[in-house]
Curated annotation (Swiss-Prot):
Belongs to the major facilitator superfamily. EmrB family. Pfam families: MFS_1. Keywords: Cell membrane, Membrane, Transmembrane, Transmembrane helix, Transport. It is found in: Cell membrane. The lineage of its organism: Bacteria, Bacillati, Bacillota, Bacilli, Bacillales. InterPro entries: EmrB-like (IPR004638), MFS (IPR011701), MFS_dom (IPR020846), MFS_trans_sf (IPR036259). It is a multi-pass membrane protein. The gene is yhcA. This is Uncharacterized MFS-type transporter YhcA. It comes from Bacillus subtilis (strain 168). GO terms for molecular function: transmembrane transporter activity.
Length: 532
């Protein structure tokens, strides 16, 4: 009788399409919601701080479940877990769509998060089981399509929906697709490995939940409240202590819930560090570009989304291709080329002005998307290929946990840099516009006089208007310079990643050399062969 792995291996692409559809919906939904936040504030009559809990709550549930995913996969099997995850996500999406108030909306988001938090490591683990290391790049390339294309196309789609329809369509539209994925998966998805009746490590689970939830909450609040805020400091410290205790406890455990011994494998450790750097760079663009395009330049959500659309198309095309290239050339060439492109294009964003052409930003973003598409999945696959099959679920859980944490910390750090540098530049501009400066005073008086003549207004009115104009431009210019400085830090992160990528190697060749060496050791020595 064929095993579940053999049945799935007969037609892996059909199963892969179903898995990608489910994962794509979960990731796309997060991007769609970000654009809808202002409309939800108006609809439910809540503040920006309150509405942010739709994102914070989702992130916290994700942060708790992802480290537990290795245990859940082993205990319940891939098939049951995928069906439950998709059911939770689809149910939560429906609740969000019909939500009459904010409380119901938040409940829907938390239900969604239960499914979304499990899907990413689960899908990744399943791909590792379906595809052998020599052809794994192709499968991971398609996995990267959902990971990178969904957040890239989300702003365009959500901007178009909000401009022409109600925000509820963003949720209603996902429900039937989610239902179809559940039905198809029910019939074609078989367990790769049979579930094992293992016990939950209660202490480890408590330490994990307290640690990751506290750290993620503290870091997410640091972006708005600052790192010196008492609540931010206390939650980050509690989270850090609990995570250290969790690591020590897991290393001493005979059957760890999350096996930190995966870091004994050098390429997995190296690829994890590079992926942390890439994640920070990716989140920098996702966070800062909408601020620049919408808050400073004045584009609509749809215009901003359309600017990002060519980059999304590049990712759509390149993600599967990068997987094929990985299978042929290995990780190092792709990582070096991808990071070179990412370094150059990220640096280009340090040169933004309030008048930077729309097409120039679009071109840079598209080229940057090309570089990113060569990076994320090949680098991650290189690390996963080094792990033995028994550690696959632990490796995917670890990779996704690090991605979640680095994304949150990266966003908070970039927010802090952007805010602090904006304040610094504003104070510098204010110093230059001091009335004690004779050059400024002369220019200011000329502007006031010209305005009085051209608009036929009083001196006080003209003076107020000129001051308002100066402060407005000072605010715009300082914000743009703050964004440029934040992108400079992201560029330096990418340079560090580029240096590290030189040390990547293709572990498939290591395994091949080891196999040949073992085969040669079994051959008789030349003298023995001659005598026989």
């Amino acid at each position: 009788m064929a095993t579940g792995k053999e049945k799935n291996a007969k037609n892996p692409m059909s199963l892969l399409i179903v898995l990608m559809a489910g994962l794509f919906l979960a990731i796309l939904n997060q991007t769609l919601l970000n654009v809808a936040m202002p409309h939800l504030m108006t609809e439910f009559g809540v503040s920006a701080t309150t509405i942010q809990w739709l994102t914070t709550g989702y992130m916290l549930v994700n942060g708790v479940l992802i480290p537990l995913s290795a245990f859940l996969i082993t205990r319940f099997g891939q098939r049951s877990l995928f069906l439950v995850a998709m059911f939770c996500f689809t149910l939560g999406t429906l609740v969000c769509g019909i939500a009459p108030n904010f409380s119901t909306m938040l409940i829907g988001r938390l239900i969604q998060a239960v499914g979304g938090g499990i899907l990413q490591p689960l899908v990744m683990t399943t791909i590792l089981l379906i595809f052998p290391p020599e052809s794994r790049g192709k499968g991971m390339g398609i996995f990267g399509l959902a990971m990178m294309f969904a957040p890239a196309v989300g702003p365009t789609l959500s901007g178009w929906i909000i401009e022409h329809y109600t925000w509820r369509i963003m949720f209603y539209g996902l429900v039937p697709i989610g239902a179809i994925v559940i039905i198809v998966a029910f019939f074609i998805f078989k367990n790769m490995v049979e579930p094992q009746k293992i016990k939950l490590d209660t202490l480890g689970a408590i330490l994990s939940i307290v640690g990751f939830a506290s750290l993620l909450y503290g870091v997410s609040e640091a972006g708005s409240d600052g790192w010196t805020d008492p609540i931010v400091l206390s939650t980050v410290i509690i989270g850090a202590i609990a995570i250290v205790a969790f690591v020590v406890q897991q290393l001493r455990h005979d059957d760890p819930m999350l096996d930190f011994r995966v870091f004994k494998y050098d390429i997995f450790s190296l690829s994890s560090v590079i992926n942390i750097i890439i994640t920070v760079a990716l989140y920098t663009g996702m966070f800062l570009l909408p601020i620049y395009l919408q808050n400073l330049v004045g584009f609509t959500a749809l215009q901003s989304g359309l600017l990002l659309l060519p980059g999304a198309i590049v990712m759509l095309i390149m993600s599967p291709i990068s997987g094929i290239l990985f299978d042929k050339f290995g990780p190092r060439p792709l990582a070096i080329i991808g990071l070179l492109v990412t370094v150059v294009t990220t640096y280009q964003y340090t040169q933004l002005t309030i008048d930077t052409p729309y097409t120039h930003i679009m071109l840079i973003y598209s080229i940057r998307a090309f570089g990113m598409s060569l990076l994320m999945m090949p680098v991650m696959t290189a690390g996963m290929n080094q792990l033995p099959a028994r550690l696959n679920s632990h490796g995917t859980a670890m990779s996704n946990t690090l991605r979640q944490i680095s994304g949150s910390i990266g966003t908070s750090l970039i927010t802090t840099i952007y805010t602090n540098r904006t304040t610094f530049h504003y104070s510098q501009i204010a110093d230059k516009t001091s009335t004690a400066d004779p050059n400024f005073l002369h220019a200011f008086q000329n502007a006031v006089s010209n305005l009085m003549v051209n608009m036929n207004v009083s001196y006080d009115t003209a003076k107020t208007y000129v001051y308002s104009h100066i402060y407005k431009h000072a605010s715009l210019d300082s914000n743009v310079m703050g964004i440029n400085d934040a992108f400079m830090w992201a560029t330096l992160f990418c340079v560090a990643g580029l240096i590290l990528s030189i040390f990547l190697r293709d572990v498939r060749k290591d395994k091949l050399r080891k196999k040949k060496k073992e085969e040669l050791s079994l051959l008789p020595a030349p003298k023995e062969a001659k005598e026989s």
